[in-house]
Amino acid sequence: MKIIVLFVFAVTAFIFKGNAQKIVPIESNGKKYEVLDMTGKGKIQWGGYEEIAGDAAKSETNGAANTIAIVAAVGENKGYEGKPYAAKLCSDAKDGGKDDWYLPSKEEADIIYTFKEKFNVEERGTIWTSTEANGTQAVTKYWYTGAHYNNQKVDEYHFVCLRKVQ
C-alpha cells in the first residue's frame, strides 16, 4: 500500500511542477519587474477582432491598463469559440502567489527584450504586447531583431506576463 501512495504522490508532484511557469526578475531604470515566462504554453492568439473602445488598449507604456481593457472587451472570446488568449491568461495567472500579472505594453516588451536570453522564445520568434494597433491588429515584438510589427489579433505567437514589484 505504501508503494502505491508514494507513486501517486510522485506523479502528482511531477505534473504540478511541469505546469509551473518560470518567474524571471528583471530591473530597468531603477524599476523592478517579474516576468512570467508563458512561452512553454505554446503560441496563442492576442484575442478576437473586437476593437477596444477608444484608445483604452493603445497605450505603449501601460500594459496593466491595456490588459484590463482587452479582457473587458474580448471577455470569453466567444467570437472565436472561447479560445484562450494572451491578455486573459495573464490576467487570470496566480503564479508565485501573485494576482497582478498583465500582458506587457510595447515599451515594456522592449525592457523584457533586453533580457531575451532568459526566455524560451525561438530565435526568430515573436511575442505579443498588449498594445492594440487597430481593430484587427496588435503590436508584436520580433525576438530576432527587436523590431515591432502589427500582426493580426487571431494569429498565434508566444507571450509573457509581467508584474511590477513594489
What name fits each language-model region?
Residues 16-101, 106-166:
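Glycine-aromatic-enriched surface loops/turns that form tight recognition elements
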Residues 1-21:
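Bacterial Sec-dependent N-terminal signal peptides
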